[in-house]
Amino acid sequence: MRIEKDNLSSYVYLPSEEAKEGWSQLSVAEMLSVNQTKAKEEFRVYEEKTCDRFQVVKEHYKDMRTFQDLSFVNRMYEKFHTFDKAKMTVWEAFDKLGNYVDSSDPDIDLPNIEHGFQTAEAIRKAGHPDWMQLIGLIHDMGKILFLWGLPSDGMEGTATGKQWALGGDTWIVGVPIPSTCVFPEFNDLNPDMIKAKKIAEETADLGEGSQGEMYEKNCGLDNCKFAYGHDEYLYRFLLHNNCKFPPEALAIVRYHSCYPWHTKGEYRDLMSENDHHLLKWVQEFNRFDLYTKDNKRPDMVALKPYIQRC
């Protein structure tokens, strides 16, 4: 990809001396692309003393573990994967998401569309391909589900509403949930976990960390089902519409919220050889998705013309 000079506005972060620690191993391009006003360790901190919306975030994950199981995911597949709810352009969809704030995110209070611009602009400045910049912009667009979802399905569109089937860290359903998930104390509330423990008691050979009999070893993540939300919806939407993205882009869309996999090293026994290649791209994307989160608003008017040329 050839990066051209332009007059687009960009972020100029002025890091504190404390925040500079931990960034020393990043390249110059990377340092220009992340929010250095916070230390790396200050992102994704799920503690009441550091998170203004801690109770909302905590309740989100409690609900997510309680209600997100294999049967729920299958029901959402049937309900939403006909893709017949509406027809709109990307920019019309963004307008619908204009006031949507993710209730599961401890790092940012801005509407999701603004985070999309933050991510895309950071990827552009780092010199990554056009397709990755575009994925950065739309990676959370699946949250448009709130227009058709029900509160009982965890699909409210308000910042303090029930969003447990729209956003948040995902995991593979139908098998025990890893203890490396955020708020692991809620894992025992999950129907899949309850079922797995019952099987373990009956057979005495299935414990946490085993993937049980639902998935074969090295079956590939494309054959697994994940906790339902914006990732899965957008992934299936792109496939349904035969969008011309490379496999790496589709993997980013589907797996970017699965922190147990791309950050904590879980599910390695389910991965195919190709998944190891895709993992590197998801991890690369995650740096821009996570470390650009900042309540400094991007200039979307200035950035939009460039995005439209991608």
Question: Model-derived features: where do they sit?
Answer:
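Divalent metal-dependent catalytic cores for phosphoryl transfer on phosphate-bearing substrates
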Residues: 108-302
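Sparse, context-dependent recognition of short Cys/His-centered cofactor- or disulfide-binding micro-motifs
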Residues: 39, 46, 65, 82, ...
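Active-site flanking loop/helix segments enriched in acidic
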Residues: 77-114, 214-221
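Ser/Thr/Pro-rich, acidic low-complexity intrinsically disordered regulatory segments
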Residues: 302-310
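Non-catalytic interface/linker regions that flank or bridge core catalytic/transmembrane domains
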Residues: 1-88, 92, 99
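Generic secondary-structure transition motif, activating predominantly at the C-termini of alpha-helices
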Residues: 58-61, 65-68, 80-84, 98-101, ...
